[in-house]
Amino acid sequence: MGALTKAEMAERLYEELGLNKREAKELVELFFEEIRHALEDNEQVKLSGFGNFDLRDKRQRPGRNPKTGEEIPITARRVVTFRPGQKLKARVEAYAGTKS
């Protein structure tokens, strides 16, 4: 099983919408740039029928160096989370196990 890349997304836009390759690539880049900007501005990104991107603050917590066993604090940080929407979940579940 492979991964869908931005280049492949642009290629599909080129093939299915008739955009030229440069326009398709720019559209994909702009889409992800808008998501990045919204998250940088502390905004939630809601894509109807797909899911939500959120920012979550994680507190500092104790961790361990796996080689030495030494306790090391894991610093507080902000992470991006994605919660799939109900429609996306339902479509993925409908196709689960149908492809090898």
Curated annotation (Swiss-Prot):
Keyword Transcription regulation: yes
InterPro entries linked: Hist_DNA-bd, Histone-like_DNA-bd_CS, IHF-like_DNA-bd_dom_sf, IHF_alpha
Keyword Hydrolase: no
Region (Disordered): 54-73
Highest taxon of source: Bacteria
GO molecular function: DNA binding; structural constituent of chromatin
Pfam families per the UniProt record, alphabetical: Bac_DNA_binding
Keywords of the record: DNA recombination, DNA-binding, Transcription, Transcription regulation, Translation regulation
Any single GO BP term: regulation of DNA-templated transcription
PROSITE patterns: HISTONE_LIKE (PS00045)
Any one Gene Ontology cellular component term annotated for this protein: cytosol
SUPFAM superfamilies with a match to the protein in the record: IHF-like DNA-binding proteins
Subunit structure: Heterodimer of an alpha and a beta chain.
Cited function: This protein is one of the two subunits of integration host factor, a specific DNA-binding protein that functions in genetic recombination as well as in transcriptional and translational control.
NCBIfam families from the UniProt entry: himA, PRK00285.1
Family stated for the protein in its record: Belongs to the bacterial histone-like protein family.
Annotated protein name in UniProt: Integration host factor subunit alpha
Organism for this UniProt entry: Pseudomonas syringae pv. tomato (strain ATCC BAA-871 / DC3000)
Gene: ihfA
